[in-house]
Amino acid sequence: MLGVLKKVFDPNKRQLARLEKIADQVDALGPEMARLSDEQLRQKTEEFKARYQQGESLDDLLVEAFAVVREGAKRVLGLYPYKVQIMGGVVLHEGDIAEMKTGEGKTLTATMPVYLNALTGRGVHVVTVNEYLASRDAKEMGQLYEFLGLTVGLNLSGMSREEKQAAYNADITYGTNNEFGFDYLRDNMVLYKEHIVQRPLYFAVVDEVDSILIDEARTPLIISGTAQKSTKLYVQANAFVRTLRKDVDYTYDEKSKSVQLTEEGMNKAERAFGIDNLFDLKHVTLNHHIQLALRAHVTMQRDVDYVVQDGKVIIVDPFTGRLMHGRRYSDGLHQAIEAKEGLEIQNESMTLATITFQNYFRMYEKLAGMTGTAKTEEEEFRNIYNMRVVVIPTNRPVIREDRPDLIYRTMEGKFRAVVEDIAQRHAKGQPVLVGTVAIETSELLSEMLKKRGIPHNVLNAKNHAKEAEIIAQAGQKGAVTIATNMAGRGTDIKLGEGVKELGGLAVIGTERHESRRIDNQLRGRSGRQGDPGVSQFYLSLEDELMRRFGSESLMAMMDRLGMDDSQPIQSKMVTRAVESAQKRVEGNNFDARKQLLQYDDVLREQREVIYRQRFEVLDADNLRGIIEKMIRSVIERVVNTYTPKEDLPEEWNLKGVVDYLNAYLLPEGDVTEGDLRGKEPEEMIELIWAKVKARYDEKETQIPPEQMREFERVVVLRAVDMKWMNHIDAMEQLRQGIHLRAYGQVDPLREYQMEGYAMFENMIAAIEEEVATYIMKAEIHHNLERQEVAKGEAVHPKEDGEEPKKKPIRKAVRVGRNDPCPCGSGKKYKHCCGRAV
């Protein structure tokens, strides 16, 4: 009964029926296209572009456009896409995932939707897992696109800005996921609009989509740099601040915890550091450090705001009095306190920009992908990326024989059996591909084969181009190839002469991977395009996956039956148990990625706000309007801080307002306490605003307008970049430490969202204050230059080497007792924060 229902309601079947109709329409245009000359075929591209501009949608053009590409492929590449490839192409155009088995021509399938979407002129990105594949596909498929009158770009790491701009301005751009992501981050750090390389993200087709959007989803791309500030400045500023006297050199308001240098204090600083104006732009960093040291000494009290434990400064939660492990004050205040207490100052390696692949690819207007194995992760694709998985049938039926697993007691017994199997197949000339999970396993097998005198190749995903050659030869008579999971992906194994008669390519798996998908990828290397083949997995009860999910009972059973190491069990029950173990691991991994995404979303929203505002700054001709808003909100904040609604007007601290204005916004005497007395806060704000505006106008008259505009831009960019960089760092520290708060029914994610939001608000306020101060107080020089706040390096996650055991970026979920403590002390967890657990 269930089978009948499935037939009627199987959504994949319904999809395929619809796709087949479209493929038939494309197919029907075949003869008509074949009659066109090369020139007429090329003209079609211009005709489509014109029709699109006149309001026809891409869906209206789809059938004809696909037929044109199909004919073009026949003429240029000598390949004519099958009907199933047309169906796959439609799935990609609709922003979904086409699951197509190995050897079914995914690369050719992608040409149709890529061509169609490139007609918009908005740029299509074709994303692959490594640069070798990107270069190969750009070269081979590029011939087809260029024949049809479109331009093709290749985006590789190490290219100059001009080369990258040219690559991105092409209709179609090939590149790796890492490079597209890094370019996005670098574009949001540029100082001039002309230096941006990417256009707005429109449509991406991701090859090996499961590898990039699921296996790599937890790997963040990071551009890091050491901020150009040394710990020396903290020490110097600390020594200077120790010499200052309250109410002479600085003023302190207990209630709002704000502290400011007086005119006398500023003069003292200028004398101490041998400079002429503390508010000169070139002394931004020094000024910042003095302010930090002042706050550390005056507003932060040991054993009230923080404690010192094991040579570390640990923050005390002001509401609960609990220690907030893993949390650091942002913006350098933590380092200033370390200097005050004479502790070792933690050097700041700064994360200048970071994004995960999940969030980068979700920014495309339309995203599509193709792979041989995606159905097992369908739920994740749907929930996170809103993409359906459509399984496209093979052009010819698969006749590969997938044998049930053989399970041995020990690893030693298993490997002996594997080598024996290889030797037998090699003796009759059948090619063998052996898949391993780790590099060590490959090397162990290689040693065993050497002893037996069997010639073989070992691939460890180090050199992509060389590997592609070896993999291409793996189907020749007598070839033996050992490969870690990911090695040579994207390259077909074609069978040599006489191999079909020997049973095709034999694939041997030496261990089940924790993901069924990766096992299926290995199997799928054999039996392509209706070729014969066989796949066999060898397992042992000592394998990691088996150990994780209770192999003890099986071990006991084998002992009872008196089975030795050379006898395997081959049972459906065990194979099912292995599959259910894999399902559990996949479920756990999905949950971990989902949780990571929830944490990451907090930073994503903040990143989008900052990057959008930063672009407005680069793009605007005149920033005065934006800056006036910033100064105004600073004035409102200051007045509201010192004139709280709950206090009587005579209790208001008007001196605090005047001290702040003198220190940061206006020359001394512009606004006095007498001017403010007897006024409502709103009136005070208007009065101060009028004075500030007048001073701003005065500045405008002192230097040429274009220089003033550049000065404004320099100040704003510098403030935004510096504060954002510190903020990313603080958010990372918060995330590392947040799990330690999972006591007393507190939801760590909710805490992270709330604190992250509060920290973001504080950062925006800090940006506004810095901009206001430098616009109003700094002297403007003639040779202004925009400066990077730090030099950035792209930190590459491993290119798809052996499936690296994923290191989740959150070291916070589960800490083993012997692992290094997440608080960063360098001690083992059990000797540090884990003592109490």
Swiss-Prot record:
InterPro entries for this protein: Helicase_ATP-bd, Helicase_C-like, P-loop_NTPase, SEC_C_motif, SecA, SecA_CS, SecA_DEAD, SecA_motor_DEAD
Binding sites annotated in the UniProt record for ATP: 85, 103-107, 492
Biased amino acid composition, Basic and acidic residues: 787-806
Protein name listed in UniProt: Protein translocase subunit SecA 1
Family matches, as NCBIfam families: PRK09200.1, PRK12904.1, secA
Required cofactor(s): Zn(2+)
Subunit and partners: Monomer and homodimer. Part of the essential Sec protein translocation apparatus which comprises SecA, SecYEG and auxiliary proteins SecDF. Other proteins may also be involved.
UniProt catalytic activity: ATP + H2O + cellular proteinSide 1 = ADP + phosphate + cellular proteinSide 2
One GO term of the biological process aspect: intracellular protein transmembrane transport
PANTHER family: CHLOROPLAST PROTEIN-TRANSPORTING ATPASE (PTHR30612:SF0), SECA INNER MEMBRANE COMPONENT OF SEC PROTEIN SECRETION SYSTEM (PTHR30612)
EC number: 7.4.2.8
The protein's enzyme class: translocase
Residues the record lists as binding Zn(2+): 821, 823, 832-833
Organism: Geobacillus thermodenitrificans (strain NG80-2)
GO MF assignments: ATP binding; metal ion binding; protein-exporting ATPase activity
Keyword NAD: no
Compartments reported by the entry: Cell membrane; Cytoplasm
